[in-house]
Each structure stands twice: as structure tokens, then as C-alpha cells.
């Protein structure tokens, strides 16, 4: 059984493309989309219940139902995932858990999670140039380190790219210490660099205009 931890890179744009193309075609697609859009840990995916989801407010509360007292870890659900979860729920009306064992429809354990992930990656691989020989994938184009925690790391870097403050991302990720979040945020992606470069350029222009205006009125 592989160990899903210490994966310190986001997925590439090409990996994201392959994931998004495979999601609609695979039984584990909604599970993978949830990891990508909400940054859940594998154990949280396995424990995820329908009453964690508030479909009206589009909020996922990890570890607590929306009717329980107290606060859980709240994560916003983007529209694309909300629609996928609604469709998925129609297939799993009699289950307490969102993601269950394939065909058996019972609670997913770690082995079932791994098998679902492995099967998803295999489908993704075959759809992008690999082929089967004696039931073994040949000429794989998937990176050897492509494992579930990469999606969690990607969610965090997506937060950074979208301009989410680090203290908010820390809460969404469920990190006990903001230094853990900071280790991810310090790996600045190109688009974040460009966004902030433009902000600083605009600030410099605005500040110069303010100084010129102040000088002109004196």
C-alpha cells in the first residue's frame, strides 16, 4: 500500500488537462474533482458524508454536519464541483458516505480508495498515449510521483494564484500551523508573480500621480 504524504509540488497544466478530461468518463471522477477543488486529504475523502455538504450555501464543512453545534473546517464549493456532487448524490441516495466502494456501495476503506485512484490514473494514462499489454500499462506518460496528495498541494497553490490570503488558505487546508501553508505559498507561481508585479506597477503610478497632484496644489 503506498504512503500518500510529503508530496511537494502542484500538478502541471498538462496533468490538470488530463485529469479534467478523464473526470466525466470515470466512476471516481467526482472524488478526484473534490480533492482538486477542496484540497481534502485521502482520509477525509473516505470519511466524507453527505451532511457535510450545504448545497444551498455551497459550503463543505469537514468533520461536522451542517446541523451540528460548533464549527468545523469550512471550504467553499465551486460551481463545477457543486453540480458534480448533485449529480453524484442522485446515484447514492441510500448512502451516508459520499464516496463508496465501486459496485458494492459500502463505506470506502483505504484499499478501496487506492484502487479507485489507481484505476482513474490508468484510464488517464491510456487516454493519453499509453497502451495495455497483458493487462500492464506500457509507455506510461504519467509521472512516477503522481499521487493523491498532489491534488491537495495544487488546491493550496490555486488559492495563492487566486489571491486568497494565506491565513484563509490555512483554514481551508486544515493546517495546524500557518508555517505549513507558508511553505507552499513561498513557491510563487508565475501568474502570482505577474499579478503582483502589475499591482506594484499600478501602485507606483497611482502614488506618483498623488505626489504630482499634491505638488501642483501647493
Residue ranges: model-predicted function:
Residues 57, 87, 91, 103-105, ...:
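C-terminal secondary-structure termini that scaffold catalytic or DNA-interacting sites
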Residues 59, 72-76:
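Well-ordered beta-strand positions in beta-sheet-rich domains
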Residues 1-46, 56, 67-70, 92:
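Basic, Lys/Arg- and aromatic-enriched nucleic-acid-binding interface segment
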Residues 1-3, 131-139, 198-201:
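Short, charged hinge/linker segments at domain and secondary-structure junctions
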Residues 18-26, 38, 75, 91-97, ...:
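Short, basic (Lys/Arg/His-rich) helix/loop patches that form interaction surfaces
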Residues 52-59, 145, 164-184, 207:
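Short, polar N-cap/turn motifs at the start of nucleic acid-interacting alpha helices
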Residues 7-8, 63-72, 101-109, 138-150, ...:
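Short, contiguous acidic/charged loop-to-helix segments that flank catalytic cores in large enzymes
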Residues 2-4, 10, 62-68, 105, ...:
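Catalytic-site neighborhood detector that most strongly recognizes the C-terminal catalytic loop/helix
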Amino acid at each position: 500500500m503506498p504512503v500518500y504524504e510529503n508530496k511537494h509540488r502542484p500538478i502541471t497544466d498538462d496533468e490538470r488537462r488530463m485529469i479534467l478530461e478523464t473526470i466525466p468518463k470515470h466512476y471516481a471522477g467526482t472524488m478526484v474533482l473534490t480533492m482538486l477543488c477542496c484540497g481534502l486529504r485521502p482520509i477525509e475523502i473516505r470519511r466524507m458524508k453527505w451532511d457535510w455538504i450545504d448545497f444551498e450555501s455551497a459550503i463543505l464543512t469537514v468533520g461536522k454536519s451542517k446541523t451540528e453545534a460548533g464549527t468545523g473546517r469550512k471550504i467553499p464549493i465551486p460551481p463545477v464541483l457543486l453540480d458534480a456532487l448533485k449529480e453524484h448524490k442522485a446515484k447514492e441516495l441510500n448512502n451516508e458516505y459520499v464516496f463508496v466502494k465501486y459496485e458494492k456501495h459500502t463505506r470506502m476503506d483505504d484499499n478501496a480508495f487506492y484502487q479507485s485512484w489507481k484505476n482513474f490514473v490508468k484510464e488517464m494514462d491510456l487516454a493519453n498515449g499509453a497502451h495495455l499489454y497483458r493487462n500492464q500499462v506500457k509507455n506510461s506518460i504519467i509521472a512516477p510521483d503522481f499521487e493523491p496528495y498532489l491534488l491537495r498541494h495544487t488546491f493550496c497553490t490555486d488559492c495563492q494564484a487566486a489571491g486568497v490570503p494565506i491565513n484563509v488558505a490555512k483554514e481551508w487546508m486544515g493546517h495546524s500551523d500557518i508555517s505549513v501553508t507558508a511553505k507552499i505559498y513561498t513557491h510563487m507561481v508565475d501568474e502570482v508573480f505577474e499579478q503582483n508585479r502589475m499591482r506594484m506597477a499600478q501602485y507606483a503610478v497611482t502614488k506618483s500621480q498623488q505626489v504630482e497632484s499634491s505638488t501642483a496644489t501647493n
